[in-house]
Amino acid sequence: MIKISQGGGRLLVGALTAMLIAACGGSSPSSSASTPSPTTAPTVVTRTDSAHGTFLVDATNQMTLYTFTHDTPGVSNCSGQCLAVWPALTVPAGAPVKGGAGVTGQFATITRADGPLQVTYQGLPLYFFHKDVAVGDVTGVYPSWVLAKP
C-alpha cells in the first residue's frame, strides 16, 4: 500500500492527468487531423455486360455514362432542357478526376456555360441519362447519344 501525504496527492493527480492527456493525443488540435486529404478514389470506373461490352460508369453511384455526338472536344453542346434529360457528370472545384482500373484514356474537366465543372473523357463531356434509375441500366443509347467506352 502506498501512503500519499496530503500535498503529494494533488501532485500525483496532476501527474496522472497530464499522462492521460498526453496518451490521448493532447488537447490541442492537430493540423493534419483537421485538414482532410484530397480523395484519390477514381471518378469513373468500368462496367461490363453481355449486351454492351465494357463501358464507363460513375464510381460513386455506378450509373452509366454517355457522350453526345454533337459535342466537340472540350465543349458541351447540351444545355437547358437537354441537361434535364442528360445531366452532366460534374465535380467540385479542385476535386481530382481519374479513372479506375481498365480506364486508360485521359480525364479532365471543362467549365460549363452554366458554371459547374463537367468531367470529360478523351476530351468529350460525360453525361447521365435521366431514365437510367438503377445500377446497370443502359437505356440512353440513341443516334446522338452513345455509351462512353474506355
Predicted ranges, named:
Residues 1-22:
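Sec-dependent bacterial lipoprotein signal peptides
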Residues 65-68, 127-129:
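Hydrophobic core segments of beta-strands in well-ordered, beta-rich domains
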Residues 75-107, 144-149:
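A low-complexity, Ser/Thr/Gly/Pro-enriched, surface-exposed linker/loop concept
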Residues 41-64, 110-124:
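Short, low-complexity cationic-aromatic patches
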Residues 24-35:
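Bacterial lipoprotein signal-peptidase II cleavage site
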Residues 99-150:
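Extracytosolic low-complexity repeat regions of secreted or lipid-anchored proteins
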Residues 69-74, 94, 131-135:
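Acidic glycine-/aspartate-rich tracts in secreted/extracellular proteins
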